[in-house]
Every structure is written in structure tokens, then in C-alpha cells.
Amino acid sequence: REGRVAEYTVAMIGPPDLPPREDVTLGERDVLQGMKVANVNPSVLSEYQLPILPEGVVVLETGLIAPRVGVQRGDILREIDGRKITVPADVVQALSTARRSVSLVVERGGQLVLLRFRL
């Protein structure tokens, strides 16, 4: 003010981890056993360098099977067999009703990728 320079010290904090991540790890009987998914929030966006608020859930860990069908850590899982994925529990539900083949729509690097595999 009035031509004077002022210096301030501001404490920086990390991005909020809200809404909660609600991590879900798929179990032994699930199609993509060991894959871990979570809600996307500002903390996850920063940690995985994701685009601004994508729709879907983020793959935190792939487990052993998911990489074999093309799923990568940091992918945003948007659809399973045409069902929109909005929360981690949707992944468990959609995969539990999977038939002989499964299709996944993931967002990777700003592009949508279709992954298909047989059970």
C-alpha cells in the first residue's frame, strides 16, 4: 500500500484428501485380483498427476492380473461392460456380474482406451 513493499510468510499445505479415497482392493475371487482403486480427489490428482477432476476411479495398484489385460497404475477406470463407474464399490459390483468377456474403458493421458479380455 502507498508504494510500500511488504513480505509475508505463508505456510503451504498439501491438497485436501476429500472426499475420502475409499480405497478398494479386489480380492482373490474377483476378476482383477489385487487391483486397488480409489475415488479421485485433489490429493489423488496431485499424487498421480491426473487431469482436473476426471470421471471414474483411479487405479492405485494393478495387482498381478490387471497389467496382463492392459490396465496401468494411474488409469482412470470409467466404464466396465457399459456400466459407468463413479465410486470404487462400482468396480466390485460390475466385475462380480461379468460374463465370458469384459470390456473396460479407461482414461490414460487424456485419451479414452478400450480394453477387452475373456475370462
Question: Where are the regions a protein language model picked out?
Answer:
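C-terminal recognition in membrane/secretory proteostasis and scaffolding
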Residues: 1-119
